[in-house]
Amino acid sequence: MPLVEETSLLEDSSVTFPVVIIGNGPSGICLSYMLSGYRPYLSSEAIHPNTILNSKLEEARHLSIVDQDLEYLSEGLEGRSSNPVAVLFDTLLHPDADFGYDYPSVLHWKLEQHHYIPHVVLGKGPPGGAWHNMEGSMLTISFGSWMELPGLKFKDWVSSKRRSLKGDRVMPEEIARYYKHYVKVMGLQKNFRENTYITSVSRLYRDQDDDDIQDRDISTKHLQIEKSNFIKRNWEIRGYQRIADGSHVPFCLFAENVALATGTLDSPAHLEIEGEDFPFVFHSMPEFGAAINKGKLRGKVDPVLIVGSGLTAADAVLCAYNSNIPVIHVFRRRVTDPSLIFKQLPKKLYPEYHKVYHMMCTQSYSVDSNLLSDYTSFPEHRVLSFKSDMKCVLQSVSGLKKIFKLSAAVVLIGSHPNLSFLKDQGCYLGHKSSQPITCKGNPVEIDTYTYECIKEANLFALGPLVGDNFVRFLKGGALGVTRCLATRQKKKHLFVERGGGDGIA
């Protein structure tokens, strides 16, 4: 039974949860699934192609993966995540996927309701998070099967909708619908609250040396979940919920643990240059796509400036190119830079992105020629400023400056999470505490097996916040957090059963 009413968070401002999850994208959904008692076991007929890992799995076949030593299981595994549990869980769900194989998962899932840990998932929109806001005309970078969550194959869901997959990659809107349906079919709705906006998350008291040092004002205010199990108010979460009539109703919750699953798409990164706030400068694909769809750029002679060398910038290039809008494409790297994402994508699977990369290499600007009619790339260039007359100033790596008249500009150089509800915007949680949190450059620093923040006990982070930008890998975060919380819950039960303390946390 949910701890608060389905329609509202605010009826009882004294409610305390063992876990509050902030963010209802795939990270938050997967964590809710596992906290609800779903447990992964090695399938009876399964043989993992990695013989060493398979031997380890056989040693404890009777135990769920949640109850096993994740450090031991993940030792020696390699993959496209810096977090070992993410690599482990991915290789269990998609064995040898990076070698081009489509082996079935070696896991099967059981619902064990006695493992349920009460929690609430707070999100701004419907379950699926930012996937509901992505440009619908572009294909996902990952295969549909890599976007799926445990227990419901994406292809099976598509078949149930009487639709067929035209290829392995799918539209973001399909993925968004899948995530929303997943929450419903898995019976997770009671844990989710939509239209919620967090304004502050603050610690009420701190532990010292892992002993319970309590704030005397709040030490007796706890919610009893079971007869012998009390939870502590480590965190206060404040915010508001937007209700049907558009009004905002404030709420206040308390939690023993908070899990940050916000993703990193909230705040587009800026160049921080003169004129960047002019209305002709966009910072997201939805903005740019809307301008094209509304015909604002139709028939324009002046080119669109696109800044960035990632896949979102490539999407913008394709969007403009396919709409017959000339493009100036500016990026700071060399086209031969081995870290360019295009070099990591097979040509057969991603022909449209390799088309962009081919243009980046072969249609670059030179001082001896004018702009090409459809597309011109400017490798190793940066934008110095935007002018009110819709001009921009570019500078090459050698210092040469050029001025161009534009019809619009799109700056797509990454994004930052909105962690304004944390002290110092959450910067103190990162590897570089003086810089904003980013997926690649400065992720949240965590224990890589529990996903607990190094700088803050009882605060967890998963998904893009810790560098796992692909859905394939963020599921490992849910496994790490669930194992950590389940282990602590067992210790708490054991402590009470043996007569330790007075039962008040």
Curated annotation (Swiss-Prot):
The keyword Oxidoreductase applies. No monooxygenase catalytic activity in the absence of NADPH. Signal peptide: none annotated. Its main location: other. It is found in: Midbody. GO terms for molecular function: growth factor activity. It comes from the Eukaryota. Ubiquitous. Expressed at higher levels in testis and ovary. Its cofactor is NADPH. Monooxygenase catalytic activity. May be involved in meiosis or the maturation of germ cells. Belongs to the OKL38 family. This is Oxidative stress-induced growth inhibitor 2.
